């Protein structure tokens, strides 16, 4: 009687963590700690007096001077709450304008054929090569000629549309929306604007969320723009208002940290609202269909 040798089962891969994974996790953790440390100490210093902040070693846990720092902040910046609301208004207006104009421009570049399309797109992309400070003086002169100095239009209009946003929208629309879908809508009698509103906008939600969050943060952190076109302290945005506290005798570091801690809250709210869209937008195209 012959016997049949059964094949020896191969040993599966070990389910343990590979040493290279441990190293990778350690590097990521170290990077996260380095990035979060300034925010941690900002919140800590907001609750301590200047004397405690400048002591060695510096405090590493919360104190009980936040109310004093906030009171000092409001004394030095009597328009602080107006500055905060003003910054929110400008950032939201710039974000809304970018979402509308960049999505329209990206839709046109992705789905329409028109004369000098390639040249115009290359020109728009070429503006990304110019450093931002190159346009500061021309922008200030134009705002002065138009009589927009110290007005919200001086901050909103120049930032209403950007090359990066147009590029993001164009690439996403070209890869996520099939032309056959738009042709079918045209056959059904839908107008071009109706196609944009009813078909394009719902399908580019992840890209809009990413662009909106990036634009809001950039507008919120904008320092040079308000510095050039705003004259009254009441019209200062948050970064400019906090910067004005330096150079006025003894710098109130506790008050600055308290104001910075308050200024971070709108960014956290925006990130919480748009984080899902941000992740979807960043991972779009990473998985091949």
Which residues fall in each region the model found?
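Short, Lys/Arg-rich, polar N-terminal cytosolic tail immediately upstream
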Residues: 1-16
């Amino acid at each position: 009687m012959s016997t049949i040798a059964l094949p020896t089962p191969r040993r599966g891969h070990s389910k343990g963590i590979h040493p290279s994974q441990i190293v990778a996790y350690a590097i990521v953790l170290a990077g996260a700690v380095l990035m979060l440390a300034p925010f941690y100490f900002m919140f800590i210093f907001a609750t301590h007096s200047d004397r405690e902040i400048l002591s060695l070693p510096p405090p590493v846990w919360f104190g009980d001077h936040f109310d004093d720092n906030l009171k000092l902040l409001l004394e030095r910046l009597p328009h602080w709450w107006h500055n905060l609301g003003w910054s929110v208004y400008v950032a939201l207006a710039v974000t809304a304008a970018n979402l509308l104009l960049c999505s329209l421009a990206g839709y046109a570049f992705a789905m329409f054929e028109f004369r000098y399309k390639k040249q115009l797109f290359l020109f728009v992309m070429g503006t990304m090569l110019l450093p931002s400070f190159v346009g500061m003086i021309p922008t200030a002169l134009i705002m002065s000629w138009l009589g927009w100095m110290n007005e919200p239009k001086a901050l909103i209009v120049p930032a209403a549309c950007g090359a990066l946003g147009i590029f993001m929208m164009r690439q996403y629309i070209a890869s996520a929306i099939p032309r056959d879908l738009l042709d079918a809508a045209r056959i059904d009698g839908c107008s071009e604007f109706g196609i944009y509103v009813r078909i394009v906008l719902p399908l580019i939600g992840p890209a809009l969320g990413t662009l909106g969050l990036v634009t809001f943060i950039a507008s919120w952190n904008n320092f040079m723009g308000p510095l050039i076109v705003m004259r009254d302290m009441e019209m200062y945005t948050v970064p400019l208002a906090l910067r004005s506290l330096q150079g006025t005798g003894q710098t109130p570091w506790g008050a600055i940290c308290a104001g910075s801690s308050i200024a971070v809250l709108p960014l956290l709210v925006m990130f919480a609202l748009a984080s899902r869209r941000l992740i979807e937008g960043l991972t779009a195209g990473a998985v091949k269909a």
